[in-house]
Amino acid sequence: MKVSEIVGRNVETLTKEEREYILSVEIKEAYNYSKGDDFFTFCIFEDGSVTKTDAVTDDEVGSSLEEMEQLESDGYEIEDVTDEYTF
């Protein structure tokens, strides 16, 4: 089980085990990607999974390091915001 496999699903469909798991896994790194009106936050979790949150819709979905690399090569500005997401 990974965080990226759980996010984006209806909360009411999550099992108790999935809820507990998603709350127990910590964020290791977080980055804001922006270009024009596009703005996303990517979080990398300690289980190796990656999620992407759209700043406009607040939708969070599973993602990948490859998607992050593609957006970087597409000219997105990247800001390290790890301190805002870790405790």
Regions found by a protein language model. Give the residues of each.
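Negatively charged, low-complexity tracts enriched in Asp/Glu with abundant Ser/Thr
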Residues: 2-22
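Acidic, low-complexity, intrinsically disordered interaction modules
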Residues: 16-87
